[in-house]
């Protein structure tokens, strides 16, 4: 019984230090490699930037965060092609990729992360329901994008999309 209590206490202490959050791993990888990051967020509204800048030492790698909520800001600030927004929609793989590449280029960063999605409660459709989120990471070698369904509650969607984006960046940094 005592051994079980010690194990539970150790687990509780470990969990409370947030050692398992993906942003901690990304923070360490970018800092150790002296590489930089910029983010472009639509549906996550700055949540990704907030998660990184909340950590001491983020200024070593975090260059900027752009909340490009409107289609116009995606085009003007990030260089997203308005024709692609019209053709595929703001919530699309093409737009997410261009956002990530655009923020990476504009900031001169090694990595660019972007999210675009439908956080709800309205705005969804049969093709793109509430909770649909495209996430992209632009690296020095390539740009990768994933589609995620992040639930139906606005707060949950923002939290999950942010976590998925940071996880995708971590995977790219790890070479996966």
Functional labels for PLM-detected ranges:
Residues 13:
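RNase H-like, Mg2+-dependent phosphodiesterase core
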Residues 2-7:
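Sec-dependent signal peptide recognition
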Residues 8, 17-176:
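Short alpha-helical segments enriched in small residues
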